[in-house]
Design a protein with these regions (language model features):
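A conserved ligand/cofactor-binding region detector
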Residues: 1-186
Length: 186
């Protein structure tokens, strides 16, 4: 029988949580036209909090970092809603966000399960892409990302992470202003 592993509740000595390296991941919404350009207006966002584990290599004298992501809400508790005796509604944003990373590969035989699985896949990919840009272009608001392929490769081991291809294209075009052809070359 599978049981939850509450790996972050007991002050895990090997995991390092770094809220300063959190990434914003947005979902849903709509695309609107502004000044002749299509702009995505997300419906909601979560904070992707990195949890790093050091993984020593066998007989190599090297240590690598395994980065896991934990989804957290930007609005964890709504006091006004709580004070109206709407207790469950007061924590809905927190529950919705944390469900994304609570269980890896949740059951997806229902429409809700399929939606959660897709949100989870997108969450991990988007957080990792934004983090890679932050790591390889530190302190740069508008870096020259044409050198991105020289700095990093993403390994797509399964069908799930291939959502990273359109997400990287979206990031390059929407957030960094590249046109389609340049983004595709990157």
């Amino acid at each position: 029988i599978e049981k939850p592993d509450y790996w972050l509740t007991n002050e895990e000595p090997w995991g390092h949580i770094d809220y300063n390296r959190s990434q914003k991941v947005s979902f849903g919404g709509e695309v609107v036209e502004e000044n002749g350009k299509k702009v995505w207006k997300p419906a909601w966002s979560v904070r992707a909090v990195p949890v790093d584990y050091m993984v020593p290599g066998y007989a190599s004298g090297r240590v690598n970092t395994l980065r896991l992501w934990s989804a957290k809400s930007y609005d964890e508790f709504d006091l006004l809603t709580f004070n109206k005796s709407e207790y469950l509604d007061a924590v809905k944003p927190q529950v919705k966000a944390e469900n994304i990373s609570k269980i890896l590969y949740p059951e997806d035989s229902t429409p809700q399960g399929k939606a959660l699985r897709l949100e989870q896949q997108y969450f991990f990919v988007s957080a990792s892409i934004h983090d890679a840009i932050r790591v390889f272009y530190p302190g740069q608001d508008k870096p020259d990302l044409t050198t991105f392929p020289d700095k990093i490769n993403f390994q797509l081991n399964d069908t799930h992470p291939v959502i990273g291809i359109p997400e990287l294209m979206r990031v390059l075009m929407d957030e960094y202003g590249y046109d389609w052809d340049t983004a595709w070359k990157i």
